[in-house]
């Protein structure tokens, strides 16, 4: 497997002493001269992979929201939301589409890698000229989630006292994140979106948009997501949190002044999460019990599947922040669209948007029952299932199926 062969970062480097900062492996080095290679080189002496002021903004624009009241009763001062747009807003302002990213995504939904964007757009198969979400017809908006680390205010951002927020950053909820996105819609002059679409954790925000702001969402697409977080999902999230906070270089969340951050903890959290993003059948078919190169697992070497997880852990380190991982994971854990609305069925039953619910048949993170609940309880909903060996990530990998499903839905809008 090409992925399994990269593996420069290892979560269990034989003989590496974790208490020695110099022993911490760096992310796998991409091709020489690529945007990713420059990012990795620049981050080699940094405790975070977050985008920071002074970095190339790429296509990002920034909305200064100011003081942001939170559901907890706290106020987040100096709030900024990073976002990107594609296409033109029609004179009637009726062609806007909001695309909401998942846990470790960002605003770069479509487009090539380049300065400010170390990776190509994460959903370019669905968004772009001539795609199902056609940027020649629609005005597409995507923001980096509040609490994230790719330009929006988060724990790695500078607090009013001039220091990074770190451990002082307040906990956020899905409703806080959606409220910030409503401020963006207001600033762009968008009263209602023709379509709000979100997958995975992005689907949490999408359903919250429709439940909390029904007049602002005409069509809704909920992909591989749920109305509330299940106990199984809470358990996986908890393990990822523990992996980060147990890293001795976490420093209780205040690691920004140190040369090394909690890279092993963040890498382990990513490896745990990535396991839930793929299916057992795919991992067995793809890797089986094959050894990684000439490594021998009998004497401490790795299986290919271990190298594969190491590779994905290392990739994340170059572009993400451990505190943001905790903040956004927390918002996933407390997600419950029915809270304060009479319960889940009542909240979903009040949604007025024409709705598409998409699930993946091999998804072991968001189970079919969650899609069934959404489709059953939302009045004007239809459900489609993606057939895939790839598990939760099937919504990204099965591009042809997703394209056909979304085109069918939008044709009736």
Model-identified regions with their sequence ranges:
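Catalytic-loop region of hydrolases
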Residues: 22-99, 113
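Cap/lid segment of the alpha/beta-hydrolase catalytic domain
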Residues: 118-120, 131-182, 233-234, 238-245, ...
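Short glycine-enriched nucleophile-adjacent loop
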Residues: 203-214, 220
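Alpha/beta-hydrolase-fold enzymes
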Residues: 216, 222-315
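Short beta-strand/loop motif that positions the catalytic acidic residue
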Residues: 351, 357-359
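Conserved alpha/beta-hydrolase "acid-adjacent" motif
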Residues: 364-370
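Catalytic active-site module of serine/aspartate enzymes centered on a nucleophile-bearing elbow/loop
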Residues: 381-413
């Amino acid at each position: 497997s090409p992925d399994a062969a990269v593996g420069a970062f290892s979560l269990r480097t034989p003989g590496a002493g974790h208490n020695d900062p110099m022993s911490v492996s760096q992310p796998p080095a991409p091709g020489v001269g690529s945007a990713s290679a420059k990012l990795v080189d620049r981050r080699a002496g940094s405790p975070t992979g977050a985008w920071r002021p002074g970095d190339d903004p790429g296509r990002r624009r920034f909305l200064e929201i100011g003081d942001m009241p939170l559901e907890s009763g706290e106020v987040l001062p100096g709030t900024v939301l990073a976002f990107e747009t594609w296409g033109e807003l029609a004179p009637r302002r009726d062609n806007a589409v909001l695309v909401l990213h998942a846990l470790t995504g960002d605003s770069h939904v479509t487009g090539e890698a380049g300065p400010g964007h170390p990776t190509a757009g994460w959903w370019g198969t669905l968004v772009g000229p001539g795609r199902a979400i056609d940027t020649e017809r629609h005005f597409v908006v995507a923001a980096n989630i509040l609490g994230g680390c790719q330009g929006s205010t988060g724990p790695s951002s500078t607090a009013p006292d001039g220091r990074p927020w770190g451990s002082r950053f307040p906990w956020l909820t899905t409703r806080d994140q959606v409220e910030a996105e409503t401020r963006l819609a207001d600033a762009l002059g968008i009263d209602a979106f023709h379509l709000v679409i979100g997958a995975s954790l992005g689907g949490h925000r999408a359903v919250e948009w429709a439940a909390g702001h029904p007049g602002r969402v005409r069509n809704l697409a909920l992909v591989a997501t749920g109305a509330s977080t299940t106990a199984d999902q809470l358990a996986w999230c908890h393990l990822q949190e523990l992996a980060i906070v147990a890293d001795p270089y976490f420093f209780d969340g205040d690691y920004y002044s140190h040369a090394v951050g909690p890279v092993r903890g963040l890498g382990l959290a990513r490896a745990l999460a990535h396991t839930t993003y793929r299916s057992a059948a795919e991992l067995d078919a793809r890797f089986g019990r094959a050894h990684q190169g000439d490594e021998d697992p009998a004497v401490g070497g790795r299986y290919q599947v271990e190298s594969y997880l190491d590779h994905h852990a290392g990739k994340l380190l170059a572009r993400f922040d451990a505190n943001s991982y905790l903040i956004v994971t927390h918002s996933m854990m407390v997600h419950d669209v029915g809270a304060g609305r009479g319960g889940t069925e009542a909240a979903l039953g009040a949604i007025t948007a024409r709705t598409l619910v998409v699930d993946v048949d091999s998804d072991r993170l968001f189970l079919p029952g969650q899609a069934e609940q959404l489709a059953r309880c939302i009045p004007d909903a239809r459900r489609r299932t993606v057939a895939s060996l790839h598990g939760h990530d099937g919504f990204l990998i099965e591009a042809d199926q997703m394209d056909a499903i979304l085109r069918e839905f939008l044709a009736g809008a």
